[in-house]
């Protein structure tokens, strides 16, 4: 009854109006699952391959018909007859079918769409929520959200090198309250920007993208918004950055002029670490992502030695949700946290392996969206299923972001008294 009878993919659009895949999995019992695949703007060079058509006459070359065809003509044929509940076997079968180290033949987008749809079909067959199916009976931790309320770098036209400026309502008693705090700060920020005559249009991830005078102007404006909303920076609400520094790193230089023009500095790795430390000393920063370039291993190790006890240092482009890179980071003492993006690696099985490896090493795992998202809310379920404790899924606007928050509200409601919001305790990698 739980045997797969059909797998079908179609091309749909993501939140940027670019094509992506939607995959449906059908079973003998009528149980059904659907998965949609996100896409990034700033991508790590070691990520699994997102297969695009390259036909410039169609969607500017970004079409996904090749990946769709790979699902409908190759993957479907291989998976029909599998038990939908055997996630690991199905994921491993697709990896073997692809046969490349980076899923470059079939496309990580094709494989991931199927992987998500299979999990959803299994949960539907068992008539249990997705988070319960993926996580089992000990599923209870609601994630502390990192809310990207100012967009810079490759996610906006704002003249700021850092890609994301986030608020982290770690002092809230519940997820529901954390979300309320975030929304109130978001609206306070909008009002402040209007009063300053700055733009209130939002970027790819729902945050504002005004023309600030620089990084510190952005940070101080966020702190003002936190206080205006009635919360205490550094006690109730903390700050986070995604530097996305690989976007402005070139030949050993962190070149801020790429995004900031003449005002921008050019820093060596040592100067970059000094600058990050200055910001940490000055502001209530609890988490920083990709502060160093994805290939600057010496820089990462030096940064971690300097700040690893005080602030969460998250590897995104640095680790690309890949256990090979994470294992090296753990061994060499580089970073203390991994960002988890399902499409960086391409299957749920490999995603869960990365989260497990991080936890065993005392690293945190932050489940994350991509800048090109859909209404699919699977990452909300993954964050709870794994008790990851942290999620990064954008600002308090745009339905593609809110879909994940609303799903977490549902899950918290369903869990009832069992639900646990750990707040600051989710940052168990910090010693000070």
UniProtKB/Swiss-Prot annotation:
Q: What does this protein do?
A: Catalyzes the reversible conversion of 2-phosphoglycerate (2-PG) into phosphoenolpyruvate (PEP). It is essential for the degradation of carbohydrates via glycolysis.
Q: Does the keyword Membrane apply?
A: no
| Biological processes, Gene Ontology terms | glycolytic process
Its subcellular locations are: Cytoplasm; Secreted; Cell surface
User: From which domain of life does this come?
Assistant: Bacteria
UniProt protein name: Enolase
What's its EC?
A: 4.2.1.11
């Amino acid at each position: 009854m739980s045997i797969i009878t059909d797998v079908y993919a179609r091309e749909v659009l993501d939140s940027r109006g670019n094509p992506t895949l939607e995959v449906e999995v059908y079973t003998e019992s009528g149980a059904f699952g659907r998965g949609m695949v996100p896409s990034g703007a700033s991508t790590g060079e070691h990520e699994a391959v997102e297969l695009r058509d390259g036909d410039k006459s169609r969607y500017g070359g970004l079409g996904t018909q090749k990946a769709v065809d790979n699902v409908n003509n190759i993957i479907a044929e291989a998976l029909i007859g599998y038990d939908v509940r055997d996630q690991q076997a199905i994921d491993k079968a697709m990896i073997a079918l692809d046969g490349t180290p980076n899923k470059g033949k079939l496309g990580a987008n094709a494989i991931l769409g199927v992987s998500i749809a299979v999990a959803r079909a299994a949960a539907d067959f068992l008539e249990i929520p997705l988070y319960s199916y993926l996580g089992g009976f000990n599923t209870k931790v609601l994630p502390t959200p990192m809310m990207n309320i100012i967009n810079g770098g490759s996610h906006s036209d704002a003249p700021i090198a850092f890609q994301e400026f986030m608020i982290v309502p770690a002092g809230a008693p519940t997820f529901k309250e954390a979300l309320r705090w975030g929304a109130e700060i978001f609206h306070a920020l909008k009002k402040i920007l209007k009063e300053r005559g700055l733009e209130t249009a939002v970027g790819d991830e729902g945050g504002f993208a005004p023309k600030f005078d620089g990084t510190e102007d952005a940070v101080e404006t966020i702190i003002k918004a936190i206080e205006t909303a009635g919360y205490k920076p550094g006690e109730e609400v903390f700050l986070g950055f995604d530097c996305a520094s690989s976007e402005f790193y070139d030949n050993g230089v962190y070149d801020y002029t790429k995004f900031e023009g003449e005002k921008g500095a050019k820093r060596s790795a040592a100067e970059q670490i000094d600058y990050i430390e200055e910001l940490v000393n000055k502001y209530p920063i609890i988490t920083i992502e990709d502060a160093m370039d994805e290939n600057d291993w010496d820089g990462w190790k030096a940064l971690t030695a300097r700040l690893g006890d005080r602030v969460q240092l998250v590897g995104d482009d640095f680790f690309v949700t890949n256990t090979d890179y994470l294992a090296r980071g753990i061994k060499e003492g580089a970073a203390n946290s991994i960002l988890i993006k399902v499409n960086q690696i391409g299957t749920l099985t490999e995603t869960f392996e990365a989260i497990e490896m991080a936890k065993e090493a005392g690293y945190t795992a932050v489940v994350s969206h991509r800048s090109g998202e859909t209404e699919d809310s699977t990452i909300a379920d993954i964050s709870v299923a794994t008790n990851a404790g942290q999620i990064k899924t954008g600002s308090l606007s745009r339905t593609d972001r809110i879909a994940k928050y609303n799903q977490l509200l549902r899950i918290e409601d369903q869990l009832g008294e069992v639900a646990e919001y750990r707040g600051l305790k989710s940052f168990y990698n910090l010693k000070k």
